[in-house]
């Protein structure tokens, strides 16, 4: 294993909601692929401790989803806060990609980046300023070739590592069926 500036960092966060001014990160996971989307390594999947008061602010969808997945209980049991989760993630990433080289990769990744900026700023600046957002291709396919969308189905577990693996697989699907190389 050696840091390679062409490797891609994929990330997913689960949050208590969508507003970084009010809501918090409750799970973070990362993985690294090479430029051809082969998974090289999976980083730690970390439940980030939040107070009962913070968890009580979740809307019905988040309560239902994160309770069903077991995430709420893992968050309550976790001893890692934002900073500890950020440092553990950075420790993993530094082995695979130099700072400032990989765009932030994932699905609707701008939302995750807003939370990183607020709660994990050292991790946020580790990424290049560019985005590799799989949802962009999904939106283009919906408009230009909608039949392609039927060929890829996501499980939608809303568990961070599962979601990242699906994002990588979804981009590989679009590369094969939508992007002309």
Curated annotation (Swiss-Prot):
The protein's name: Oligoribonuclease
Location of the protein in the cell: Cytoplasm
First-level EC class: hydrolase
Active site: 129
Keywords: Cytoplasm, Exonuclease, Hydrolase, Nuclease
Domain Exonuclease: 8-171
Name of a matching Pfam family: RNase_T
EC code: 3.1.15.-
Function (record text): 3'-to-5' exoribonuclease specific for small oligoribonucleotides.
GO CC term (a single one): cytoplasm
Transmembrane segments: none
Family from the record: Belongs to the oligoribonuclease family.
Species this chain originates from: Shigella flexneri
A GO MF label: nucleic acid binding
InterPro entries named among the record's database cross-references: Exonuclease_RNaseT/DNA_pol3, Oligoribonuclease, RNaseH-like_sf, RNaseH_sf
Taxonomic path: Bacteria, Pseudomonadati, Pseudomonadota, Gammaproteobacteria, Enterobacterales
Keyword Cytoplasm: yes
UniProt record, GO biological process: DNA metabolic process
Predominant localisation class: cytoplasm
